[in-house]
């Protein structure tokens, strides 16, 4: 029989993975360095007591797994651009979560809002600026 404590633990693990995967996705889509994506994901996991974990980021995908559990995720990155403002915003949310200033739920909500945030420049503006 599965104990309530085990279910709560797995729910927390899943929420943590949701948060760090969203953070990693936003960072990678916004042009962040690969090492920063992996480091952010690991720091978020460690802040929630998940020490035995693996994060792997590539330009086209991110992977995360927790040792000795059946929890693992993969996210394919289909488009990206350079949005340093969004990278800074995601890093700020990560810092607030790791320092304990916000909860997992608050971090997820902030990241979800950042995901909806429009790029500061349109493709047309970028093209005109480059010429």
Residue ranges and their predicted role:
Residues 1-102:
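Soluble N-terminal domains of membrane-associated systems
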Residues 103-111:
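Non-transmembrane, extramembrane segments of multi-pass ion/lipid transporters
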Residues 110-118:
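Cytosolic juxtamembrane amphipathic/interface segments immediately preceding
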Residues 119-131:
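Core alpha-helical transmembrane segments of integral membrane proteins
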């Amino acid at each position: 029989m599965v104990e309530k404590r085990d279910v709560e633990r797995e729910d927390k693990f899943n929420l943590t993975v949701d948060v760090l995967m969203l953070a990693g996705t936003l960072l990678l889509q916004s042009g962040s360095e690969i090492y920063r994506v992996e480091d952010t994901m690991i720091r978020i996991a460690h802040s929630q007591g998940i020490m035995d974990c693996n994060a792997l980021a590539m330009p086209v995908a991110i992977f995360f797994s927790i040792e000795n559990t059946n929890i693992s995720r993969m996210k394919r990155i289909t488009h990206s651009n350079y949005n340093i403002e969004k990278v800074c915003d995601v890093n700020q949310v990560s810092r607030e979560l790791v320092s304990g200033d916000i909860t997992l739920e608050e971090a997820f909500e902030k990241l979800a809002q950042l995901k909806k945030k429009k790029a500061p420049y349109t493709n047309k503006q970028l093209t005109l600026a480059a010429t």
